[in-house]
Design a protein with these regions (language model features):
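C-terminus-biased signal that marks the final domain/tail of proteins
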Residues: 1-239
Length: 239
């Protein structure tokens, strides 16, 4: 294998999309997604916050080959609402979108945060968990008896709304209009709240030290927020 060190990158960051940059040319997958990622990261340039990564590359429907972003299409242009979901960064097979947020030199590694959106990224919002908390994570992110975690299960339910065709090549057809109109706004709103609350707690850890009791209280509130989100979104499933 070949190790790439981000310190050697003139841009100060690296991004990869499945295929081997150092391997045999034109083998592997993800070349078109790489072009999409290139556009997104170069336009942003710096200050890649967890929120930006989760809400931009992870949910982007910019096509690296066709140079077209679905968000720029009007409802009328979308017609019946369906698009062919091929070579976008979020794929039908996507199972999660996660961001590891480390600490600065001299800071406590226990404050390292995993922002975890489990399930199809456009239908799931991120909830933070802390390294220092060990196995203490929100119940909505936990699974029992090999069942799906509640957050994952609900993301799968929402995914079923935007990929409603189950026969033949149905999983290639995304109801983008429904996703954009009925689901993404609620996902982004829920995630913005979660990130704001998580960042506030993390800042207190930096100044006051890691506190497991604060994490437990945060987790309980995160579970309540998830339950409220799930209840609110039930009307989408009942249409």
């Amino acid at each position: 294998y070949f190790r790439f060190d981000v310190k050697d990158s003139p841009k100060g960051y690296l991004y990869r999309t499945n295929f081997s940059v150092a391997g045999v040319e034109d083998q592997g997958a993800g070349y078109i997604r790489y072009e999409a990622a290139t556009k997104l990261f170069e336009e942003k340039g710096s200050e890649f916050t967890p929120g930006w990564i989760l809400d931009n590359p992870a949910r982007s429907f910019y096509h690296g080959l066709m140079k077209r972003d679905l968000k720029d299409l009007s409802d009328r242009q979308l017609g019946e609402g369906y698009v062919i979901s091929q070579d976008y960064i979020p794929r039908y097979t996507t199972v999660s979108s996660i961001v590891f947020e480390g600490v600065n030199p001299g800071e406590d590694p226990a404050n390292t945060v995993l922002w975890s959106a489990i399930g199809y990224a456009p239908c799931s919002y991120a909830i933070p968990v802390w390294v220092g908390a060990g196995d203490e994570i929100p119940a909505c992110l936990s699974s029992k008896d090999k069942a799906l975690a509640p957050a994952n299960e609900f993301a799968m339910d929402l995914k079923g709304i935007v990929f409603p065709i189950t026969r033949g090549n149905g999983n290639k057809y995304l109801d983008y209009l429904t996703l954009r109109r009925d689901i993404l706004p609620a996902i982004v709103k829920a995630e913005d709240k979660e990130i704001a609350e998580g960042e506030k707690l993390n800042k207190s850890f930096i100044t006051e030290g890691f506190n497991i009791e604060k994490v437990r209280k945060f987790n309980a509130k995160a579970d309540k927020r998830f339950e409220a989100f799930r209840e609110k979104m039930q009307k989408i499933l009942e249409k």
